[in-house]
Amino acid sequence: MAQGHTTASAILHNFRELIKEPKGLDDAANYLFQGLLDDVVAGIFIEIHHLRKTGNLTALDGVGEENAESAYRICEMPNLDIFGISTAKKPMDCTCPNCDRLVAATRFAPHLEKCMGMGRISSRIASRRLATKEGSSASSTSTSTYLQSGNTGGTDDEDDVDWSSDKRKKKSTQNSRNNGSKKNNGKTF
């Protein structure tokens, strides 16, 4: 950049020297034109050299006229868009890595969750199994004596304590239920 600035100032200095003489006005115009032309040609030469060395020169060439027509050809075949790409929906299937089944892509995540036993329902079932195993291992002797006694009829609810309270709350009336409540119970105002 500094080199271009010194070149321009040198051109102006030499141009002013030539203008001082009216006879050299024609020479001054030629000198100015020649200096500007040399700068432009040198700049273009350096830019093209740089593009060729970096491999970007082919991008400036553009597309030939023969190739231009084929590049913008519109496809008018059925089931294809204007670029020639199929518009039919392709079924996206995935293979489950756990069971090697083909599963639709939209159902892959839920399938994998169930297949690997990591879903909500699976974790609940696993929790029940663990609780059952712990309960059965702790009371294995009582269960075995219960089964050995031949007591297969009835339920084991008979010995359980009822969790419901004997005292039942009275149903509240409609007025007491709405006191202080912001619900309108379907009524419109």
UniProtKB/Swiss-Prot annotation:
- This protein is called SAGA-associated factor 11 homolog
Provenance organism: Drosophila virilis (Fruit fly)
Instruction: Report the family membership.
Output: Belongs to the SGF11 family.
User: What are its GO cellular component terms?
Assistant: cytoplasm; DUBm complex; nuclear pore; nucleoplasm; SAGA complex
- What's any GO biological process attached to this entry? regulation of transcription by RNA polymerase II
Q: Which cysteines are joined by disulfide bonds?
A: none
Chief location category: nucleus
Please give the record's comment on domains: The long N-terminal helix forms part of the 'assembly lobe' of the SAGA deubiquitination module.
- Top-level lineage group: Eukaryota
